[in-house]
Swiss-Prot record:
Predominant localisation class: cytoplasm
Protein name: Regulator of G-protein signaling 6
Residues annotated as domain RGS: 1-66
GO biological process: negative regulation of signal transduction; positive regulation of GTPase activity; positive regulation of neuron differentiation; regulation of G protein-coupled receptor signaling pathway
Functional description taken from the UniProt entry: Regulates G protein-coupled receptor signaling cascades. Inhibits signal transduction by increasing the GTPase activity of G protein alpha subunits, thereby driving them into their inactive GDP-bound form. The RGS6/GNB5 dimer enhances GNAO1 GTPase activity.
Single annotated GO MF: protein domain specific binding
Membrane topology reported for the UniProt record: Peripheral membrane protein
Highest rank taxon of the organism: Eukaryota
Keyword Ribosomal protein appears in the UniProt entry: no
Length: 66
């Protein structure tokens, strides 16, 4: 849901929300950590640097296919 909501955020809020999602779900020691394969994790960690609305697309697709 966090990723879906990110896509609807005003552009000025997107980068901040990307960082919040990263820290909550994907960063080392994240409190609500999700498990991604190494390929999806690498792509997503690179995308976080750009901070766009579609930063988590690969991760979302990977989780959906589980």
């Amino acid at each position: 849901l966090a990723v879906q909501d990110l896509k609807k955020q005003p552009l000025q809020d997107v980068a901040k929300r990307v960082e919040e999602i990263w820290q909550e779900f994907l960063a080392p020691g994240a409190p609500s950590a999700i498990n991604l394969d190494s390929h999806s994790y690498e792509i997503t960690s690179q995308n976080v640097k750009d901070g766009g609305r579609y930063t988590f697309e690969d991760a979302q697709e990977h989780i959906y296919k589980l």
